């Protein structure tokens, strides 16, 4: 895992076309902005896990999403 330190307003690059910008810090919360191409899905981890779980559940049921 790469660990970086960024200040509010600073950006990091992932590849050539994804940027992650620190928008704000308040207490133990950090607001970030992600710019990525439309074909790249960006989700919070808990949402991604729910999507994966629903895919698995629908495959087990034999239905499609």
UniProtKB/Swiss-Prot annotation:
Q: Output the superkingdom of the source species.
A: Bacteria
A single GO molecular function term of this UniProt record: mRNA 5'-UTR binding
One Gene Ontology cellular component term attached to this UniProt record is: cytosol
Compartment(s) of residence: Cytoplasm
Instruction: Supply the Pfam families for this chain.
Output: CsrA
Which UniProt key words apply to this protein?
Answer: Activator, Cytoplasm, Repressor, RNA-binding, Translation regulation
One GO process term, biological-process aspect: positive regulation of translational initiation
Oligomer and partners? Homodimer; the beta-strands of each monomer intercalate to form a hydrophobic core, while the alpha-helices form wings that extend away from the core.
Query: Which protein family is it in?
Result: Belongs to the CsrA/RsmA family.
Q: What does this protein do?
A: A key translational regulator that binds mRNA to regulate translation initiation and/or mRNA stability. Mediates global changes in gene expression, shifting from rapid growth to stress survival by linking envelope stress, the stringent response and the catabolite repression systems. Usually binds in the 5'-UTR; binding at or near the Shine-Dalgarno sequence prevents ribosome-binding, repressing translation, binding elsewhere in the 5'-UTR can activate translation and/or stabilize the mRNA. Its function is antagonized by small RNA(s).
Name of this chain's protein? Translational regulator CsrA
The opening ranks of the lineage are: Bacteria, Pseudomonadati, Pseudomonadota, Gammaproteobacteria, Oceanospirillales
